[in-house]
Structures are given as C-alpha cells and as structure tokens.
C-alpha cells in the first residue's frame, strides 16, 4: 500500500506489476536521455557563436531526426505491447470472481461456488478499530488464494466505476452493460488496498477495495465456512 510522503510506485505483488515497474524504468531512462540531449543542444545554441544563416537544407540532419524518433518509439512500443498482451491474456483460471460496482459499494460473487457472494462497504471512521486505515477498510474483504491465476469479471449496475488495486497492477473499468476481465495473481500473501478510480458521484472517495491473499489451504477452509 501507499505511505505518506512516498516517492515512487507501490511494491509489486504480481508478475504484471513487476513488468509494469520494469517498463516504467525503461521508459524513464529513454525520457531522461532525450531530455538531456535537448537541454545540451539548447545550451549549445545559447553559448556558441557559430550560426548558419545561409543553410537552406540539411538532408543528413533531416534523415537522422526522422529515423531516430522512429527507433525510440519502437523501443517503447515493443515492451508496452508485450505487457498489454500479458494483462489481457487469461490462461486456465482456477477461480472466477464477478465484481459489480454500485453507488457506492462493491459486490462480489464467486461463480465457482454456490451462494458465495457478498457486498463490500467501507467501514465508517467512527467504527474503525485501532490500527485500521481510514477510508480504506471494508466490512467484507475479497479472499483469494496466492500464486494462482484468478479471473475477475468486472461490470457496473449504475454508472462508470473503476476497480483498481495498484500493488497488483490492476485497473479495470466497470461499465454498465459491459463485462471486462482482469487477471489477479499474487506472489505473496498479504492485504492489498485499492479504491474506485473513476469519478462516480458524491461518495466516489468512499468505495475502497481490500484483497486478502492467503495460501490455497486456508482459502479452501474459508470458502467451506462461507457456503
């Protein structure tokens, strides 16, 4: 989760988030090199006395500034397309969870189990226990097994919402009448927080998401107790 005064991204918990962080560093390095080159050329123009007022064309320069940006775009596009494919591809999910956005709460249905569904509301500030996080705790957490591919089917009952958990690299729009999907795979157990990331009305800020990732054995015990 995020901390006060934190700089940078949240710690990666899923393979997709690890890839996104690597891509962020890769792209940031390219941007840094381009910015350094541009600043160097600007400083050179301001300090040098060499001018070329009679130059009408420069084929070599035009070729370079056409080919070089194309190469840079390819270097950015290829890893980006690879990650997009990874985020969209779901191979043999062991579990499917249907997520519905409402004003202003989430409802979850474990489609592989009978009668395993619940609503998830934010816990009001005056009902929080010591150590719980303001505006982030819910009455019913989403319990999921770790190290297994899980498919989330995401939609909405009313207006646009967005189901987002930054540590897992997840952000999927919840659109009325449309079913979007996302892959959840956690590398380690823990509790991970997210929020609705699409302005959906006056209580948009009060739609937290809490995932509790646990080993498969404990998940089976929990699901048995819930059904």
UniProtKB/Swiss-Prot annotation:
Residues 46-59 are mitochondrial matrix. Disulfide bonds: none annotated. Cu cation A1 binds at residues 161, 196, 200, 207. Its cofactor is Cu cation. GO terms for molecular function: copper ion binding; cytochrome-c oxidase activity. Mg(2+) binds at residue 198. Binds a dinuclear copper A center per subunit. Residues 1-14, 88-227 are mitochondrial intermembrane. Keywords: Copper, Electron transport, Magnesium, Membrane, Metal-binding, Mitochondrion, Mitochondrion inner membrane, Respiratory chain, Translocase, Transmembrane, Transmembrane helix, Transport. Cu cation A2 binds at residues 196, 198, 200, 204. It is a multi-pass membrane protein. PROSITE patterns: COX2, COX2_CUA, COX2_TM. NCBIfam families: CoxB. Belongs to the cytochrome c oxidase subunit 2 family. This is Cytochrome c oxidase subunit 2. It comes from Desmodillus auricularis.
């Amino acid at each position: 989760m995020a901390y006060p005064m934190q700089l940078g991204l949240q710690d990666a918990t899923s393979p997709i988030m690890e890839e996104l962080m690597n891509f962020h560093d890769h792209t940031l390095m390219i941007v840094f090199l381009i910015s350094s080159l541009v600043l160097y050329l600007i400083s050179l123009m301001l300090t040098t006395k060499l001018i070329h007022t009679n130059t009408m064309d420069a084929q070599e320069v035009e070729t370079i500034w056409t080919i070089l940006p194309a190469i840079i775009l390819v270097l950015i596009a290829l890893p980006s397309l690879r990650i997009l494919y990874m985020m969209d591809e779901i191979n043999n999910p062991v579990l499917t969870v249907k997520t519905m956005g409402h004003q202003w709460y989430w409802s979850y249905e474990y489609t592989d189990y009978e009668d395993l569904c619940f609503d998830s509301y934010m816990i009001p500030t005056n009902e929080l226990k010591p150590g719980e996080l303001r505006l982030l705790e819910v009455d019913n957490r989403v319990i999921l097994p770790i190290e297994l591919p899980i498919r989330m089917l995401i939609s909405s009952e009313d207006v646009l919402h967005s189901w987002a958990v930054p540590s897992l690299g997840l952000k999927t729009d919840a659109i009325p009448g449309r079913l979007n999907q996302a892959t959840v795979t956690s590398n380690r157990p823990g509790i991970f927080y997210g929020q609705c990331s699409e302005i959906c009305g006056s209580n948009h800020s009060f739609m937290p998401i809490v995932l509790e990732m646990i080993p498969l054995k404990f998940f089976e015990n929990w699901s048995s107790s819930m059904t």
